[in-house]
Amino acid sequence: MGPEAWVRPLKTAPKPGEAIRLILFIYLSCFFLPVMSSEPSYSFLLTSFTTGRVFANTTWRAGTSKEVSFAVDLCVLFPEPARTHEEQHNLPVIGAGSVDLAAGFGHSGSQTGCGSSKGAEKGLQNVDFYLCPGNHPDASCRDTYQFFCPDWTCVTLATYSGGSTRSSTLSISRVPHPKLCTRKNCNPLTITVHDPNAAQWYYGMSWGLRLYIPGFDVGTMFTIQKKILVSWSSPKPIGPLTDLGDPIFQKHPDKVDLTVPLPFLVPRPQLQQQHLQPSLMSILGGVHHLLNLTQPKLAQDCWLCLKAKPPYYVGLGVEATLKRGPLSCHTRPRALTIGDVSGNASCLISTGYNLSASPFQATCNQSLLTSISTSVSYQAPNNTWLACTSGLTRCINGTEPGPLLCVLVHVLPQVYVYSGPEGRQLIAPPELHPRLHQAVPLLVPLLAGLSIAGSAAIGTAALVQGETGLISLSQQVDADFSNLQSAIDILHSQVESLAEVVLQNCRCLDLLFLSQGGLCAALGESCCFYANQSGVIKGTVKKVRENLDRHQQERENNIPWYQSMFNWNPWLTTLITGLAGPLLILLLSLIFGPCILNSFLNFIKQRIASVKLTYLKTQYDTLVNN
């Protein structure tokens, strides 16, 4: 803001920062303590408005404090000084959102600024500044060419005399200057976020900061945004193909070249249209149900995204004893790759497999590590799979060739999660939200926390409900496999139809080249014919169908009564789990209450009799016998 437009306030010394308030929370312990649900962690990022560069970040957990603070230097918020003539030429014009503060001040004489010049940044210690929010109600205050500060009425925070260093959403203050002033460490600031639970932080809030200096008030803009923080390790794929870890979102070419000519124009076969039962929404519904049981706060407002490229599934480790039997596995492992395996699990290992050099060394529970025997077969328990280096299977023989490792897992769809505001940013037009955020795989780490640490307990039956939801989701994956089998059937029928068309074309070509001895002679081939081997596909698909039906029957026969209770009506399940605790306490009181009451009454009677005897002894003298 220039001096010709308005009269700026008089300069005074900066107002000292407010003292830090210490809030003590006292938790009262009762005889019965409610089970508390775990709160998710969040990361608050302080970034550049124009480039998205991260200046500072801090971690915050809901319920721990009502404020989030950043420690950052004033010069960190400004861009790096231009070093070359080309960089100077590419600098944005003054007011274009970010300016070269070092070039703006020039570092000549006693002038100050940010950069490597000696004493330049130290001179900023006596310079005031002011801030304007990017979401000001007045539309004229949202001008990025003036750093959201085209007028003094737009200012909400300021360090000069009479200005406020605190607003309803943000406060900023200087901290004591360091004794040793080095580059980007001369003007430390404390930026505090108020009400971190507010939904507006998901979208990100931006401010413009301008220095109160003679002439043009140079400035910069920054953004503070809240993101769900999930700790997760690098994926550990297992299967025949382990190099398919493409990102969930990729740019596709705008145009596709379709100029490749077709050799023959053949009539399209008239296939009967077949409809598959849609399973994607049911899979996402199962994931959200499980997420709602284990992490209800995250499930309140979120977007679930399925991965569009293989591998489509991930595994959650299961610690259980594998069933052994005679060599009776009739199907070989399917060539499906599990994108990641999380948690601890039971493992099968064959001779020659180097587990110490494998990423699954920490995954395999040493007490449940089994060496594969060539005389038996191993079968996964109900609702689980064996994710092997050769593929995915329910049963595996000990005679499988080559070094082999199998991990017992629950197979789950590879799902990515966005918070509600971030998901809306994802589908918004690019001109509204130019900066997209990379998806974070959330499902597997949360489920690993459920099975290892029990961090998802939200009530007395939360763990049982979480296990029930996990089994339900695993069953949904089986249904998805069934749909894949139906899709293979349709593709098989299409291949059969295409084969018929090809044979018809071959007959026509044989007639056309009859004078040359037929098509094979014209092409110079000694033998050319089509061998239809689709019967093998049909037989394999039939076995897959039989295995799915058999596992479904075993699952229905082995459901415990306490798990079947959670398949009832939701309100009835909630009522039963809510009344179970009080009813159990009442039953124990009726059984042991009379005994405890009689013991207490006898104790009281004994104490009363002892007091009476003591009182009587004080009223009389003891007679001495001669």
Swiss-Prot record:
Locate the motif CX6CC.
520-528
UniProt xrefs under CDD domains = HTLV-1-like_HR1-HR2 (cd09851)
Residue ranges of the region described as Fusion peptide: 439-459
Q: Which Pfam families match?
A: TLV_coat
Which ranges make up the Extracellular topological domains here?
Answer: 39-575
Task: Please report any disulfide bonds recorded for this protein chain, giving both cysteine positions.
Answer: C520-C527
Region span, Transmembrane protein: 439-626
User: What membrane topology does the UniProt entry give?
Assistant: Single-pass membrane protein
Could you list the residue ranges that cross the membrane? Answer: 576-596
Tell me yes or no: is Ribosomal protein among this UniProt entry's keywords. Answer: no
Superkingdom is: Eukaryota
Residues the record annotates as the site (Ancestral cleavage site) are Q438, A439
Similarity remark: Belongs to the gamma type-C retroviral envelope protein family. HERV class-I T env subfamily.
Can you quote the domain comment?
A: The CKS-17 immunosuppressive domain is present in many retroviral envelope proteins. As a synthetic peptide, it inhibits immune function in vitro and in vivo.
The name on file for this protein is Endogenous retrovirus group S71 member 1 Env polyprotein
The gene name on file is: ERVS71-1
